[in-house]
């Protein structure tokens, strides 16, 4: 009898990755153990994973070599390859020459241009690290500097080696993503490693339970779908404000400069603003003069005498800004710092959590004009031709240059809430306070029941370092908050710089003693991570601490990016999402209390606040949004008790409750922080309330499951989805699918001035109140994906394009031609072809000073090959996606476990979003697979189908007598009342054969049947998979028409 060998494995669900060039941990030689004249760094991938017990592992991979492809001549031999690689090594120099570890000739398809499935010749070239990888890439680019602006562009005709034009392929895809594609593992999925294929680290270097080194080849996908308990930390800070306005971490003299200019502008006789008056107003800031309109300044240097101020002012008056050579730096600094100082008029970061772009994000500001005349500061102020912004800028910079440095506003409170994913409530809460903090008798039981730990610190430094200490102690996998990437992280970092504890404060990684900073390549200064995101409301710069082993989720960014809300204030968002309907009430007038009964109490705790909405034809805030404190929660009766006797009218309205922030105003926060220990508890509880709100929001919208499913579908890590734009996920997905089809993606240079193309069509609405005639809606199921599939629109099916002007003159064409100027791949046997026509546009000015206007300048015809078997890359990807979504929805219908049902739902939504985004990315100039002709052809097909749907319905149901399923005969005269992108809205104007109108409910019954019939009729003449169908919510649509048109 033979016994099977049991192979032991370890399994982890991956969630974060730390990628860098460094010295081998396996060799353990350290920096000094290598030849300093050679590039000895390796490409290192640190993977973080969680097991079912909630323990974290650090898995180091050192043997994956970054690579890309270079398209070369189809006749190249091994000799040509060796000579070309030697040429590249020569370009790299002696230091990097050994960093190319492998190269070989391969045959692959290329993504762009139809070529009858031809295989082309490429060199696959691999490097030890990304430093050498990127250095070799520079050969294919040309650098320029125009007016001080650095620009790097792809060589238009490739890199010319001898007589061969060489082109880069697959070089813009992060090497980490290629590892996922090759090993077929998911960055948020389960992996397994054989225990005999791993090496345990000799010396502990992380805060993880386990530390391993292994080969990437030993990472295998685990057939597992267990739920893991991510540890989640939600934090929020409160800051002081010396002037009672928006907190500023590092202060200059802008407030004093603003006060002085406001005084000057209000003067009737401005000649009285002389040297004496100017000096008096500056000294008033230091308390030596009485000027009611001048705010006090708080210098770091204490007890500055009047004599010292006199000496400073004397030098200050001699200062001529135009002669100051360092003012260029000031101008640059101004662009970065204005986003903070411009918040002076905001009530508070908390009141404006995401509500205003200026408060929520560091938005780019226009450059202030510098003052170039030879004049001192007083003369600049007195110059009536000088702009106010310039005066303010020059005065602020001059005061900051000569007068003592000012104290910034301090971090006074940090709240932290910790919850394990899938648990029903947080397990620990912290309030870190600068100063004493005493719990009032009323809240002592609340503190015990919610495991609230209050930590008192005497200094701001102590507050910041305690935050780091708790982060290490609790060791969360996910760190969240509201607008933390726009305010909290940046404020804390700048305060740590100001008080000299930056390195200790930023040891927030899962790697022991790792300081979470990077060097800014422009300034050479150490900074926290910065990122730029583009949303519908504009372009924003974000700052956050990149913590290896911890995922940052800013819920303010999530809601701005993925939801359309009337407000993005935390108070509104909490009330909108964390809410439910009121079933009944018991009013206790004697004790001035009301018990509220509701099915769902998620997110509510004793001591938090709720507000109510009255819902009828519209939604109104009950008592103008008044907030009520919760005194008690009874889970057995599904009810909570509020601190007021409220007669909610459940007969007249549908009443909803919504979670609200603590009822503490901004000014109260600033004032209470400087009062008694009990007063400070009020602020601390408020701060902790915001932490709890964010935790419940994260759970309610289930952003974790949503992003995990998208991560696994597109093979991109969670932090890519949360911190980068939308393009990277589709780039990864398309690259993976191309790889499966032996196809490579080139690096493409985008033409930013190629005009654009026409989007979706909208029919002019026939406005009216449709009360008696039901309006039906028939739309196309997945219009753009279906159009790409049905017409085989793809980069690799495009045969040629011909562009004409408005006079039908051919002005340009593309496509491979032979010596006789014939298109090589046109009219091939076994292929059919589809031509798509669309208008071309340019942005033109009618006059030199007029605004640019999008103008039709001609048209373009694109020819796409229709394959005898299968589809081109993009349609094939879409077919896979639509098929996967259908299968997932089928599984969801069979699943009984609500948690798994939710996972399937998030999965099918991720597939839907990816499928619908593919067309858009084809037309996005920032896309890695930009192809305007495919996107423009897709919208052209969409417009054609929209008109087709309208024409079929209006044509086939025009004065036609139809017998319905119940035998009733009706006369139809279909009329389109509106149409948009993929939908046609129409009414049948039903009558009996005798000419009597059929209206209201009976008309609705007939309209539903006729609309379904019309959709089926139109679908018969369409290519698969295009379907024209009735919307399922036709009844709801009718009520919307009645209420809103």
From Swiss-Prot:
The EC number(s) this enzyme carries: 2.7.7.7
A GO molecular-function descriptor: DNA-directed DNA polymerase activity
InterPro entries the UniProt entry points to: DNA-dir_DNA_pol_B, DNA-dir_DNA_pol_B_exonuc, DNA-dir_DNA_pol_B_multi_dom, DNA/RNA_pol_sf, DNA_pol_palm_dom_sf, DNA_pol_type-B, RNaseH-like_sf, RNaseH_sf
Disordered: region residues: 331-355
UniProt record, GO biological process: DNA-templated DNA replication; viral DNA genome replication
Ranges of Acidic residues composition bias in the record: 335-348
Similarity field: Belongs to the DNA polymerase type-B family.
Name this protein carries in UniProt: DNA polymerase
Source organism of this protein record: Phaeocystis pouchetii virus (PpV01)
